């Protein structure tokens, strides 16, 4: 979900949780014994006390309260490895004792897939694996996958004024899941996705083996950089390429409160600006409707000075009507805090910030052609019917159009103009209306269908949507034809890259230890595995 303002401080606990084993369950005891014998002691088990450390830890990185309800499945164990070796041992023990594994980096899975499952499961929470090592000389960094984007940005800003990284602008998103799905952000038009700038990685496979880029092989290294999180193994760390930024750049964050007609015109003009600006300039927009008026928040980042930024906007988007004081010069690190709605760089380092504590559901689209003015108008009229609905729009173009569709699994490159996200959010006291909210979102999504990508209508795995379908891995009749069933969402997220992802999955995790309802399946039959040699 797009992070928004209204930050609430969260508790900062987490050092070492005492092991507390629930008796009477042989499976639980076997896993506890295995973890302890391998030196993994930092775990807690399911508790009936809602004030226990177990529930504090479960909810600490649960970013969608929709999945906090008592009726939603809970993990039997939450394990917090503190080293590469402990992560390896945790995966080994869970696999040996046949537990379903859920890997949680920041907890931003839109469908709660990092902390829910239909079978007895273990959350492997990566938050203690959040160390970051910056090498300014080589312009690279090693980032443990439990580090949030905010922690990464803070570490870079403390080390250099002339290097940055391209990733999302919500600081509490975990780097493990974000990069695994691609990772779009405010500098993607200049440098591509986060995953495009990964040069090495450490992966723990289902047997607990520790693999670097060379050991995992080209297909698997390609797959983990955009093929989705929680599928290939446990990412211990990424080695990323740091990217040049000026000592001072320019940003703006401006909200326009206007009538629906004027808002429609602004959005209609924005779409032509967003993907055609120089790659050094990105303008994104959030929007919704309150009463009779729409609100549009325009977020801009220019890798240059204020005068140049204002000249470009005055020429390309004069309708926005920005004045001199609305352009602000600051360092790259300060800009990451500013665009997140934070006051200081140091706040980037707080992984427990809560930007919006409402439950939510989202959908995403990509466009390849311009959207007519009347479509924006009607979309805003639909938003006026639902106070909890809003949109987030991003332009592509620039570097995104220059990178080949198969460079990483993320295929939405040349020809893709815009990414639209539709969100509906609601408060706890509105849970009785969930059906109404879901129906509205489906109606909104259906309305946009003629104006977005087609055959198939594509999506983005970091905005995972179970409405598209899913596999119940408990049902053997589903798994026998899993590759074809999964094609329904696999080709929406990855287009023609789906086949290579299946190949990579079969190579690294043939027993499908790492799975969720929309994970990439391995080939199940011997003749299918033999076909890998032909791919």
Curated annotation (Swiss-Prot):
Gene3D superfamilies: 3.30.465.10, 3.40.462.20, Uridine Diphospho-n-acetylenolpyruvylglucosamine Reductase, domain 2. There is a cross-link at residues 108-170 (6-(S-cysteinyl)-8alpha-(pros-histidyl)-FAD (His-Cys)). InterPro entries: BBE, FAD-bd_PCMH, FAD-bd_PCMH-like_sf, FAD-bd_PCMH_sub1, FAD-bd_PCMH_sub2, Oxid_FAD_bind_N, Oxy_OxRdtase_FAD_BS. Its main location: cytoplasm. Keywords: Alkaloid metabolism, Cytoplasmic vesicle, FAD, Flavoprotein, Glycoprotein, Oxidoreductase, Signal. Expressed in roots and stems. Not detected in leaves or reproductive organs. Restricted to the parietal region of sieve elements adjacent or proximal to laticifers. The FAD cofactor is bound via a bicovalent 6-S-cysteinyl, 8alpha-N1-histidyl FAD linkage. One of its GO terms (molecular function) is FAD binding. It is an enzyme of class 1 (oxidoreductase). The keyword Membrane does not apply. GO terms for biological process: alkaloid metabolic process. Its EC number is 1.21.3.3. This is Reticuline oxidase. It comes from Papaver somniferum (Opium poppy).
């Amino acid at each position: 979900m797009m992070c928004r303002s209204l930050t609430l401080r969260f508790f900062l606990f987490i050092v070492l949780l005492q092991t507390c084993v629930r008796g009477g369950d042989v499976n639980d005891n076997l896993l506890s014994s295995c973890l302890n014998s391998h030196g993994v002691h930092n775990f807690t088990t399911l508790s009936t006390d809602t004030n226990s450390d177990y529930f504090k830890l479960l909810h600490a990185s649960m970013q969608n309260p929709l999945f906090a309800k008592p009726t939603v499945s809970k993990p039997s164990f939450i394990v917090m490895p503190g080293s590469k070796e402990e992560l390896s041992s945790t995966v080994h023990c869970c696999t040996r004792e046949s537990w379903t594994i859920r890997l949680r980096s920041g907890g931003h899975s839109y469908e709660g897939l990092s902390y829910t499952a239909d079978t007895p499961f273990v959350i492997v929470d990566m938050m203690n694996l959040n160390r970051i090592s910056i090498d300014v000389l080589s312009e690279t960094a090693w980032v443990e996958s439990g580090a949030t984007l905010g922690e990464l940005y803070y570490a870079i800003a403390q080390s250099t004024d002339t290097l940055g990284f391209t990733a999302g602008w919500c600081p509490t998103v975990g780097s493990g899941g974000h990069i695994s799905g691609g990772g779009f952000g405010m500098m993607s038009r200049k440098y591509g996705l986060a995953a495009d700038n990964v040069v090495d990685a450490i992966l723990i496979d289902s047997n607990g083996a520790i693999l670097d880029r060379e050991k995992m092989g080209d297909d698997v290294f390609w797959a983990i950089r955009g093929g989705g999180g929680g599928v290939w193994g446990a990412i211990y760390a990424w080695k990323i390429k740091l990217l040049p930024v000026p000592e001072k750049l320019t940003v703006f964050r401006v909200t326009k409160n206007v009538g629906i007609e004027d808002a429609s015109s602004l959005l209609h003009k924005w779409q032509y600006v967003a993907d055609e600006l120089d790659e050094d300039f990105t303008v994104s927009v959030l929007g919704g409707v309150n009463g009779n008026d729409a609100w549009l928040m325009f977020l801009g980042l220019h890798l240059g000075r204020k005068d140049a930024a204002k000249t470009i906007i005055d020429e390309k988007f004069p309708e926005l009507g920005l004045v001199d004081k609305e352009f602000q010069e600051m360092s790259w690190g300060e800009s990451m805090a500013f665009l997140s709605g934070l006051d200081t760089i140091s706040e980037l380092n707080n992984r427990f910030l809560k930007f919006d504590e409402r439950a939510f559901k989202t959908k995403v689209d990509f466009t390849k052609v311009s959207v007519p003015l009347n479509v924006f108008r009607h979309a805003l009229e639909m938003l006026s019917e639902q106070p909890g609905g809003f949109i987030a729009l991003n332009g592509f173009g620039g570097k995104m159009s220059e990178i080949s569709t198969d460079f990483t699994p993320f295929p939405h490159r040349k020809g893709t103009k815009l990414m639209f996200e539709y969100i509906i959010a609601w408060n706890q006291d509105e849970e009785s209306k969930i059906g109404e909210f879901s129906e509205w979102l489906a109606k909104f999504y259906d309305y946009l269908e003629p104006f977005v990508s087609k055959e198939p209508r594509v999506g983005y795995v970091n905005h995972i949507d179970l409405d598209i379908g899913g596999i119940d891995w408990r049902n053997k009749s589903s798994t026998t034809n899993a590759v074809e069933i999964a094609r329904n969402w696999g080709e929406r997220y990855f287009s023609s890259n789906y086949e290579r992802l299946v190949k990579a999955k079969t190579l690294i995790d043939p027993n499908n230890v790492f799975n969720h309802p929309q994970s990439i399946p391995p080939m199940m039959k011997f003749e299918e595995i033999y076909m890998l040699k032909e791919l």
